[in-house]
Amino acid sequence: MKVDLTIEYRGKLITPNQIKLLIALHKTKSQNEAAKLLNIKPSSFNIQLKRLENKLGVKLYYSSPNGTVLTDAGLEILETYNSYSKRLKNHFFTVSGFVSGEIAKILFGNPIITSFDNALKLLKMGFVDVLGVDDSYWIYRLGDERFLKSEIGSCDFNIFLIAYDNFVMVSKKEFNYKNLVGIRFSSQRIVYNILKKEGIKFKVKVRVKNPFRAIELVNEGYSLFLNESLLRYIDGDFNVIYPNFYEKTVHAINFISFGKDIEIDKKEIKKIKKLGFKI
Protein backbone atom coordinates (compact mmCIF):
# COMPACT_ATOMS: atom_id res chain seq x y z
CA MET A 1 0.00 0.00 0.00
CA LYS A 2 1.69 3.18 -1.19
CA VAL A 3 0.64 6.42 0.47
CA ASP A 4 2.97 9.42 0.31
CA LEU A 5 0.56 12.29 0.92
CA THR A 6 0.06 14.23 4.14
CA ILE A 7 -3.28 15.99 4.57
CA GLU A 8 -4.65 18.54 7.02
CA TYR A 9 -7.84 17.95 9.00
CA ARG A 10 -9.18 20.43 11.55
CA GLY A 11 -5.81 22.13 11.69
CA LYS A 12 -3.92 18.89 12.36
CA LEU A 13 -1.62 17.07 9.94
CA ILE A 14 -2.36 13.42 9.19
CA THR A 15 0.74 11.53 8.06
CA PRO A 16 0.89 8.90 5.28
CA ASN A 17 1.21 6.10 7.87
CA GLN A 18 -1.88 7.34 9.69
CA ILE A 19 -3.83 7.49 6.44
CA LYS A 20 -2.79 3.87 5.79
CA LEU A 21 -4.51 2.88 9.04
CA LEU A 22 -7.82 4.31 7.85
CA ILE A 23 -7.51 2.88 4.34
CA ALA A 24 -6.72 -0.60 5.68
CA LEU A 25 -9.58 -0.51 8.19
CA HIS A 26 -12.03 0.76 5.58
CA LYS A 27 -10.97 -2.02 3.22
CA THR A 28 -11.02 -4.95 5.67
CA LYS A 29 -13.58 -3.78 8.29
CA SER A 30 -11.45 -5.55 10.89
CA GLN A 31 -8.59 -4.25 13.00
CA ASN A 32 -6.91 -7.66 12.97
CA GLU A 33 -7.13 -7.97 9.19
CA ALA A 34 -6.07 -4.35 8.73
CA ALA A 35 -3.01 -5.03 10.90
CA LYS A 36 -2.14 -8.05 8.74
CA LEU A 37 -2.50 -5.94 5.61
CA LEU A 38 -0.02 -3.41 7.01
CA ASN A 39 2.23 -6.14 8.44
CA ILE A 40 2.03 -4.84 12.01
CA LYS A 41 0.70 -6.30 15.27
CA PRO A 42 -3.02 -5.78 16.02
CA SER A 43 -2.09 -4.15 19.33
CA SER A 44 0.17 -1.68 17.51
CA PHE A 45 -2.59 -0.94 15.00
CA ASN A 46 -5.07 -0.20 17.78
CA ILE A 47 -2.63 2.03 19.67
CA GLN A 48 -1.82 4.05 16.55
CA LEU A 49 -5.50 4.44 15.72
CA LYS A 50 -6.29 5.61 19.26
CA ARG A 51 -3.44 8.11 19.10
CA LEU A 52 -4.82 9.49 15.86
CA GLU A 53 -8.26 9.89 17.42
CA ASN A 54 -6.77 11.73 20.39
CA LYS A 55 -4.75 13.94 18.08
CA LEU A 56 -7.77 14.92 15.98
CA GLY A 57 -10.28 14.95 18.83
CA VAL A 58 -12.83 12.87 16.90
CA LYS A 59 -14.04 9.27 16.82
CA LEU A 60 -12.80 7.53 13.66
CA TYR A 61 -14.42 4.08 13.84
CA TYR A 62 -17.14 2.04 15.54
CA SER A 63 -18.32 -1.58 15.70
CA SER A 64 -21.34 -2.61 13.62
CA PRO A 65 -23.00 -5.84 12.45
CA ASN A 66 -20.92 -5.45 9.28
CA GLY A 67 -17.63 -5.22 11.19
CA THR A 68 -15.51 -2.27 12.29
CA VAL A 69 -16.37 0.68 10.08
CA LEU A 70 -15.24 4.28 9.77
CA THR A 71 -17.29 7.12 11.19
CA ASP A 72 -18.32 10.09 9.06
CA ALA A 73 -15.15 11.85 10.21
CA GLY A 74 -13.01 8.90 9.13
CA LEU A 75 -14.73 8.76 5.75
CA GLU A 76 -14.31 12.52 5.33
CA ILE A 77 -10.56 12.16 5.87
CA LEU A 78 -10.35 9.44 3.23
CA GLU A 79 -12.42 11.52 0.80
CA THR A 80 -10.04 14.44 1.32
CA TYR A 81 -7.05 12.17 0.76
CA ASN A 82 -8.53 10.70 -2.43
CA SER A 83 -9.37 14.17 -3.73
CA TYR A 84 -5.83 15.46 -3.14
CA SER A 85 -4.33 12.28 -4.56
CA LYS A 86 -6.26 12.66 -7.83
CA ARG A 87 -5.21 16.30 -8.14
CA LEU A 88 -1.56 15.44 -7.63
CA LYS A 89 -1.62 12.79 -10.33
CA ASN A 90 -2.68 15.41 -12.87
CA HIS A 91 -0.49 18.33 -11.80
CA PHE A 92 3.16 19.22 -11.46
CA PHE A 93 3.84 21.51 -8.52
CA THR A 94 6.92 23.68 -8.22
CA VAL A 95 7.26 25.68 -5.01
CA SER A 96 10.11 28.14 -4.55
CA GLY A 97 11.49 30.78 -2.27
CA PHE A 98 11.57 34.33 -3.58
CA VAL A 99 15.10 34.19 -5.02
CA SER A 100 14.94 30.66 -6.42
CA GLY A 101 11.51 31.63 -7.72
CA GLU A 102 13.16 33.92 -10.28
CA ILE A 103 14.87 30.85 -11.75
CA ALA A 104 11.79 28.67 -11.32
CA LYS A 105 9.79 31.04 -13.54
CA ILE A 106 12.24 30.27 -16.35
CA LEU A 107 12.48 26.52 -15.79
CA PHE A 108 8.93 25.62 -14.78
CA GLY A 109 6.67 28.37 -16.09
CA ASN A 110 4.24 29.00 -13.25
CA PRO A 111 5.75 28.20 -9.84
CA ILE A 112 4.25 28.91 -6.45
CA ILE A 113 6.58 31.54 -4.95
CA THR A 114 6.35 31.95 -1.20
CA SER A 115 8.35 32.14 2.02
CA PHE A 116 10.15 28.96 2.95
CA ASP A 117 8.00 28.23 6.00
CA ASN A 118 4.95 28.17 3.72
CA ALA A 119 6.87 26.01 1.24
CA LEU A 120 7.56 23.51 4.02
CA LYS A 121 3.85 23.38 4.87
CA LEU A 122 3.06 22.52 1.25
CA LEU A 123 5.86 19.95 1.30
CA LYS A 124 4.38 18.32 4.40
CA MET A 125 1.04 18.06 2.60
CA GLY A 126 2.65 16.33 -0.38
CA PHE A 127 2.02 19.17 -2.84
CA VAL A 128 5.61 19.62 -3.98
CA ASP A 129 7.36 17.95 -6.91
CA VAL A 130 10.21 20.47 -7.08
CA LEU A 131 11.29 22.78 -4.26
CA GLY A 132 13.41 25.88 -4.84
CA VAL A 133 15.67 26.68 -1.89
CA ASP A 134 17.19 30.13 -1.33
CA ASP A 135 19.41 29.13 1.60
CA SER A 136 21.67 26.07 1.47
CA TYR A 137 21.17 25.63 5.21
CA TRP A 138 17.83 24.05 4.39
CA ILE A 139 19.51 21.64 1.98
CA TYR A 140 21.49 20.44 4.98
CA ARG A 141 18.35 20.18 7.12
CA LEU A 142 16.36 18.34 4.48
CA GLY A 143 19.31 16.00 4.03
CA ASP A 144 19.01 15.04 7.69
CA GLU A 145 16.89 11.89 7.82
CA ARG A 146 15.65 12.77 11.31
CA PHE A 147 14.31 16.12 10.08
CA LEU A 148 12.58 14.49 7.12
CA LYS A 149 10.88 11.86 9.24
CA SER A 150 9.65 14.39 11.80
CA GLU A 151 8.52 16.95 9.23
CA ILE A 152 7.36 15.12 6.12
CA GLY A 153 8.03 11.41 6.56
CA SER A 154 10.63 9.44 4.66
CA CYS A 155 11.07 10.26 0.99
CA ASP A 156 13.68 10.19 -1.74
CA PHE A 157 14.88 13.32 -3.49
CA ASN A 158 17.68 14.68 -5.65
CA ILE A 159 19.46 18.00 -5.20
CA PHE A 160 20.29 20.19 -8.19
CA LEU A 161 22.65 23.14 -7.77
CA ILE A 162 21.42 25.52 -10.45
CA ALA A 163 23.15 28.86 -9.88
CA TYR A 164 25.06 31.15 -7.52
CA ASP A 165 24.19 34.58 -6.17
CA ASN A 166 25.86 37.29 -4.07
CA PHE A 167 24.75 40.04 -1.71
CA VAL A 168 25.03 43.78 -2.29
CA MET A 169 24.34 46.74 0.01
CA VAL A 170 21.21 48.78 -0.72
CA SER A 171 20.12 51.98 1.00
CA LYS A 172 18.24 55.22 0.38
CA LYS A 173 21.00 57.39 1.82
CA GLU A 174 24.17 56.31 3.60
CA PHE A 175 24.28 52.59 4.40
CA ASN A 176 23.67 52.04 8.12
CA TYR A 177 24.89 48.72 9.51
CA LYS A 178 22.95 49.36 12.72
CA ASN A 179 19.60 49.84 11.00
CA LEU A 180 19.24 46.72 8.89
CA VAL A 181 16.16 44.95 7.60
CA GLY A 182 16.52 41.18 7.72
CA ILE A 183 14.86 38.60 5.47
CA ARG A 184 13.88 35.35 7.13
CA PHE A 185 14.85 32.09 5.37
CA SER A 186 17.30 33.93 3.12
CA SER A 187 21.07 33.43 3.00
CA GLN A 188 21.66 36.71 4.85
CA ARG A 189 23.10 34.63 7.69
CA ILE A 190 26.23 34.35 5.51
CA VAL A 191 26.59 38.13 5.52
CA TYR A 192 26.04 38.35 9.27
CA ASN A 193 28.77 35.76 9.88
CA ILE A 194 31.13 37.75 7.66
CA LEU A 195 30.36 40.97 9.55
CA LYS A 196 31.12 39.25 12.85
CA LYS A 197 34.45 37.95 11.55
CA GLU A 198 35.31 41.37 10.10
CA GLY A 199 34.52 43.01 13.44
CA ILE A 200 31.79 45.18 11.91
CA LYS A 201 29.05 45.99 14.41
CA PHE A 202 25.53 45.65 13.05
CA LYS A 203 21.94 45.42 14.20
CA VAL A 204 18.89 43.98 12.48
CA LYS A 205 16.03 46.28 13.48
CA VAL A 206 13.20 44.54 11.63
CA ARG A 207 12.71 41.16 9.96
CA VAL A 208 10.36 40.24 7.13
CA LYS A 209 9.76 37.07 5.10
CA ASN A 210 9.54 38.75 1.71
CA PRO A 211 12.53 40.50 0.05
CA PHE A 212 10.15 42.75 -1.87
CA ARG A 213 8.74 44.00 1.43
CA ALA A 214 12.34 44.53 2.56
CA ILE A 215 12.96 46.67 -0.54
CA GLU A 216 9.91 48.77 0.37
CA LEU A 217 11.36 49.31 3.85
CA VAL A 218 14.52 50.80 2.32
CA ASN A 219 12.30 53.75 1.40
CA GLU A 220 11.60 54.15 5.11
CA GLY A 221 15.29 54.53 5.92
CA TYR A 222 16.41 50.96 6.54
CA SER A 223 19.54 49.50 4.97
CA LEU A 224 19.47 46.12 3.27
CA PHE A 225 21.78 43.32 2.18
CA LEU A 226 19.96 42.20 -0.96
CA ASN A 227 20.50 39.36 -3.39
CA GLU A 228 22.22 40.77 -6.46
CA SER A 229 19.74 38.93 -8.68
CA LEU A 230 16.93 41.12 -7.28
CA LEU A 231 18.55 44.47 -8.08
CA ARG A 232 16.22 45.05 -11.02
CA TYR A 233 13.37 45.46 -8.54
CA ILE A 234 14.85 48.42 -6.66
CA ASP A 235 14.15 52.10 -7.29
CA GLY A 236 16.59 53.97 -9.49
CA ASP A 237 17.48 56.45 -6.76
CA PHE A 238 18.62 53.78 -4.29
CA ASN A 239 22.31 53.53 -3.48
CA VAL A 240 23.90 50.20 -4.39
CA ILE A 241 27.32 49.32 -3.00
CA TYR A 242 29.36 46.19 -3.64
CA PRO A 243 31.02 45.46 -0.28
CA ASN A 244 34.71 44.63 0.07
CA PHE A 245 33.65 41.13 1.11
CA TYR A 246 31.34 40.74 -1.90
CA GLU A 247 33.06 37.57 -3.15
CA LYS A 248 32.65 35.95 0.26
CA THR A 249 28.87 36.34 0.07
CA VAL A 250 28.52 33.87 -2.80
CA HIS A 251 25.90 31.21 -2.10
CA ALA A 252 24.17 28.45 -4.01
CA ILE A 253 20.60 28.44 -5.27
CA ASN A 254 19.40 24.85 -5.21
CA PHE A 255 16.36 22.92 -6.29
CA ILE A 256 15.19 19.71 -4.68
CA SER A 257 13.37 17.29 -6.94
CA PHE A 258 11.06 14.62 -5.57
CA GLY A 259 11.09 12.04 -8.35
CA LYS A 260 11.37 14.55 -11.20
CA ASP A 261 14.37 15.23 -13.43
CA ILE A 262 15.57 18.81 -13.92
CA GLU A 263 17.26 19.58 -17.21
CA ILE A 264 18.46 23.01 -18.34
CA ASP A 265 19.15 23.94 -21.94
CA LYS A 266 21.45 26.69 -23.25
CA LYS A 267 18.61 29.18 -23.74
CA GLU A 268 17.51 28.78 -20.13
CA ILE A 269 21.09 29.18 -18.89
CA LYS A 270 21.35 32.42 -20.86
CA LYS A 271 18.10 33.71 -19.33
CA ILE A 272 19.22 32.80 -15.81
CA LYS A 273 22.54 34.62 -16.29
CA LYS A 274 20.67 37.64 -17.60
CA LEU A 275 18.85 37.85 -14.26
CA GLY A 276 22.18 38.35 -12.51
CA PHE A 277 22.85 34.81 -11.36
CA LYS A 278 26.16 33.06 -11.94
CA ILE A 279 26.35 29.55 -13.37
From Swiss-Prot:
Keywords: DNA-binding, Transcription, Transcription regulation. InterPro entries: Tscrpt_reg_HTH_LysR, WH-like_DNA-bd_sf, WH_DNA-bd_sf. One of its GO terms (molecular function) is DNA-binding transcription factor activity. Residues 31-50 bind DNA. PROSITE patterns: HTH_LYSR. It holds the Pfam family HTH_1. One of its GO terms (biological process) is regulation of DNA-templated transcription. Residues 14-71 form the HTH lysR-type domain. Belongs to the LysR transcriptional regulatory family. This is Uncharacterized HTH-type transcriptional regulator MJ1120. It comes from Methanocaldococcus jannaschii (strain ATCC 43067 / DSM 2661 / JAL-1 / JCM 10045 / NBRC 100440) (Methanococcus jannaschii).
